[in-house]
Amino acid sequence: MSDNTPWFEGIRFPMVCFSPEILREVRDKFLVKDEDTITVTYPKSGTNWLNEIVCLILSKGDPKLVQSVPNWDRSPWIEFTGGYELVKGQKDPRVYTSHLPLHLFPKSFFSSKAKVIYCIRNPRDALVSGYFFLSKMNVTEKPETLQQYMEWFLQGNVIYGSWFEHVRGWLSMREMENVLVLSYEDLIKDTRSTVEKICQFLGKKLKPEETDLVLKYSSFQFMKENEMSNFTLLPHAYTTEGFTLLRKGTVGDWKNHFTVAQAEAFDKIYQEKMAGYPPKLFSWEEC
């Protein structure tokens, strides 16, 4: 991969909407407030779905906000140059998003009571989703083949760095009372129970009919048709023809794309990198 994208502290970032100065300020100077709710993921791990769910929980299922405000405005990415300004201007309680690895996250979070919801996904599916997503985006060098992107991914030479380091970093926080770790697979398998778990974590009591509305308006089909959620409002300069954010929304799609050799090579590195974690910690081991 050619070096035409910005780097900060050893991590590659997209070519647009980022600067080392803002990333440094976010880490060192941004003040996280106790009332903040922050959704955090490695890219292509259910970020926008989780954001939709959280926004709908906070509105008790009322879809007005998610149908009238683009997702990057209602839950801005704090590390984006524009998103950072939006977060600073938000009224309390603030809701925002990040893909940042733990060591680049705002330092003030670690002495706050702010709530972080971290969603993990089978890295094989995150890889395949990332490949198709970045193949149609003008924010970093486009992979020519899945094999090429897999090599970049396993080397950590992709935007936001290594999946393994990202997940290991955030999993180290999983016993903290203000951090909730979820999996994309659980969201797919039992959406209602996972939504209820998020409600409990956020201290929000929803009536059954309100939970029904959250499930309805955060469903794949509703989000796919909602221009405030499906990224069709992105400037055309950022995307190429055929771009889609919500491609499949399924579990195990990697099996349709990995060769046997690729699956074996990935598994070898996965076992090395994730040694020491109990398999039951990861829902995809059961899928």
UniProtKB/Swiss-Prot annotation:
Its main location: cytoplasm. It is an enzyme of class 2 (transferase). Adrenal gland and liver. One of its GO terms (cellular component) is cytoplasm. GO terms for molecular function: alcohol sulfotransferase activity. Pfam families: Sulfotransfer_1. InterPro entries: P-loop_NTPase, Sulfotransferase_dom. The active site is at residue 99. SUPFAM superfamilies: P-loop containing nucleoside triphosphate hydrolases. Its EC number is 2.8.2.2. 3'-phosphoadenylyl sulfate binds at residues 44-49, 121, 129, 184, 218-223, 247-249. GO terms for biological process: steroid metabolic process. Homodimer. Belongs to the sulfotransferase 1 family. This is 3-alpha-hydroxysteroid sulfotransferase.
